[in-house]
């Protein structure tokens, strides 16, 4: 069984924690070229392309300018990303065995790096999937990565029993030929919703928290059977058998 999650927009380049081992991203060469291409844009252009304010644009302009230098140093992906999902995974208390299990069974999508393992060393960046780089033929990052990642992704899932737990955001499917993925492996997508006035509603912050907590649950408990996910409970969220299917696991909360 393999789990995959999305990258986060917020990142840090520092951590007091040391991972037991480190690894190099599989698509490091492509990531470096992508970063070099991004370094050609001005801060004003990045503000528009990334849809951010001028401060964040200036910060990422400098990140891309310094990407190929020795400073800042790289950090393991699971520690570098600091979004809500990653805060809830909380790798700061992982044992070496937890990190190794995550390295073997968790994958992280990235518009810059393509597909990452948790201990892959990465640098801070900001990227969007719809950005079109001239050096990449003017196609979006979604279309650039799709033919590169699909076969690798399917092969890795099959090597881990042919079951994928999809905890990534919806847009990340566009990095792959998702129709092929669903044809060749079993995809199970957990969702997290709240009952409000008799209707199920998605509260984004809760959904992100639960994705992180479920990822942590999988890693800490070495989950290999998707049926064991049904035992996940967190802050009132629990498996809702009446609104779940073989490919869609709903965890609901009574508000």
Curated annotation (Swiss-Prot):
- State any GO BP term from the record: response to hydroperoxide
Q: Which cellular components does GO assign to this protein? A: cytosol
Q: Which domain of life does the UniProt lineage start with? A: Bacteria
Looking up Pfam families in the UniProt record yields: H2O2_YaaD (PF03883)
Q: Which NCBIfam families match?
A: PRK02101.2-5 (NF002547)
What's the family? Belongs to the UPF0246 family.
Q: What is this protein called?
A: UPF0246 protein BVU_0413
Q: Which organism is it from?
A: Phocaeicola vulgatus (strain ATCC 8482 / DSM 1447 / JCM 5826 / CCUG 4940 / NBRC 14291 / NCTC 11154)
